[in-house]
């Protein structure tokens, strides 16, 4: 359902966001979005933009409203991203107190200790704007004090890969654990967040593509080598690729690959990747991750289909790595043709 009264902007169009806030006329601004949508990044940029215009801004995060029961509820729901783990009523009560009495005591939650460790005392309400960063849910109490509600949106496959990359870098979790967690998070996101877009006053779209920052660019160059010219075979893998269409043209195809060392052997590993053609059918930018637990295949397929990506087909290829002196060559064979993978920084 489309709300014709909503404002729209991209994450880089801060002037449009500021104009919408000014026109709405509210002191209270809610910022929400799915996991890895960059809502925290946007919230920080919005605070900086308002401050640069001379406004005084108070920032409140729903992360500080996890409670001492969070660990118990985590065991119940299986994820920290479930909205029932956050004390939204307590947060709304503090917002009411701030606007009605001009002062409030705000909790400070420690993720390390997993408890509220202190309080921030606001004794005088001398702020022009109050920014509240939420998870992704709509609370029926939000209409109090005429809030301006901003939702940070993005393509679903982009959210998945940002989270996969971010969590591996941030907490060094195994890939299969991250995917298992996302398999719990995205159904919640569809129920509590995605289905309630029409309730937001403004949609801010994050069109950042992770391939631009993290992707490897390469060309598949058609070749006609004799096997004897390639040197010594180092590794050969037989690959079945399952393709999922992107939700937006040009944003990239998601590929889940079965990898076999023996053509008729057992599944050796699984690769999940996101790739995009760079205007040329043989030029690609790709980000990929591999895990050597075969059962991971079912988990990643379940995640992608739960998230709503459309399965579009299957392809087969053989990938071989040869070494000839100091030179290492990767050859991909598909449908009887051979292609050499040439990294962009190797090309003259």
Positions of PLM-derived features:
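Hydrophobic positions on the alpha1 helix immediately C-terminal to the Walker A/P-loop
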Residues: 42, 46
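Conserved lysine of the Walker
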Residues: 39
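ATP-dependent NMP and nucleoside kinases share a basic, alpha-helical "lid"
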Residues: 117-167
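The conserved Walker
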Residues: 35
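N-terminal strand-loop-strand beta-hairpin
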Residues: 216-324
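Extreme N-terminal, non-catalytic leader segments
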Residues: 1-30
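Small-molecule kinase domains that catalyze NTP-dependent phosphoryl transfer to phosphate-bearing small molecules
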Residues: 139, 169-214
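Conserved nucleotide-sensing/catalytic segment adjacent to the nucleotide-binding pocket
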Residues: 58-61, 67-115, 129
